């Protein structure tokens, strides 16, 4: 009934949670769901936790001020809302409207040295050069305080190469990084691009590395026969990293836990390779 995408990991009290989009093939829309890593290495049955009348994806989960939040993608509603856990991880409520009248997708929360920003991708209604709306986007940076937007957004980039977010931002060796999607050739998630954010005000970033689907496929253990045609979300936690992919063989989307990390002080991240011990 479902295929899966947009995985986010969260570890709490010794339990590893995997939050993801569960696309319901019967209802033709995405829902937010989670699964728990069991002691034998398997995953519990999925549980849907947020189901709206419109499509949901990219369940960006994070902790702030001792509370748990999810900031999903809900572009079909032309809004961006923040959900707060009433009873983690099963019960959630809308706690505020972050943005309205926006065609926004895959938004990430940035906090560095006490300063907060929202970096969101806004899709075009009239896409240039025959591109797909999901591929060609504009990046807007909004100032925030206490998880509330405090000013107008500033467009910082647009295009199809690395502009659309592909996971959370993270800090490594005091450097702030963003991972984006390579959507060139009118292909959604053709690869991934890593950027270092060198300045937030004004916003500046520089490309560090990029990976094609073929390169990403080398790190995925599932029996995909090298026929991966898309990968567009990558995240990690203290002990795990996770990635989604679609394959030509099955025309389905899957989530892959790449490896469990036993020594977190190594250069541990298989996809990011050179990046040392990281945190959000």
Which residues are covered by each model-predicted region?
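Carbohydrate-active catalytic/glycan-binding domains of CAZyme proteins
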Residues: 1-280
């Amino acid at each position: 009934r479902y295929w899966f995408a947009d995985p986010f990991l969260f570890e709490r009290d010794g339990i590893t949670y995997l939050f993801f989009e569960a696309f319901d093939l019967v209802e033709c829309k995405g829902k937010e769901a989670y699964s728990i890593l069991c002691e034998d290495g398997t995953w519990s049955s999925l549980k849907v936790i947020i189901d709206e009348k419109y499509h949901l994806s990219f369940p960006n989960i994070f902790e702030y001020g001792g509370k748990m939040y999810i900031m999903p993608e809900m572009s079909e509603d032309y809004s961006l809302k923040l959900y707060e856990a009433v009873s983690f991880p099963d019960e959630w409520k809308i706690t505020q409207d972050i943005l309205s009248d926006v065609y926004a997708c895959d938004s990430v929360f940035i906090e560095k040295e006490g300063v907060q920003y929202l970096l969101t991708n806004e899709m075009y209604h009239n896409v240039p050069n025959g591109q797909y709306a999901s591929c060609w986007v504009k990046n807007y940076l909004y100032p925030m305080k206490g998880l509330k937007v405090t000013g107008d957004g500033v467009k910082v980039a647009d295009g199809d190469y690395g502009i659309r977010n592909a996971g959370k931002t993270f800090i490594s060796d005091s450097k702030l990084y963003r991972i984006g999607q390579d959507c060139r050739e009118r292909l959604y998630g053709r690869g991934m691009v890593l950027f270092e954010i060198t300045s937030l005000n004004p916003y500046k970033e520089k490309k560090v590395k990029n990976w094609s689907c073929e390169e990403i496929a080398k790190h995925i253990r599932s029996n995909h026969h090298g026929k991966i045609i898309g990968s567009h979300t990558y995240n990690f936690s203290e002990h795990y990293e996770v990635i989604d992919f679609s394959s030509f063989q099955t025309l389905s989307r899957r989530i892959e836990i790449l490896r469990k990390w036993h020594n977190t002080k190594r250069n541990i991240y298989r996809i990011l390779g050179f990046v040392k011990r990281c945190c959000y």
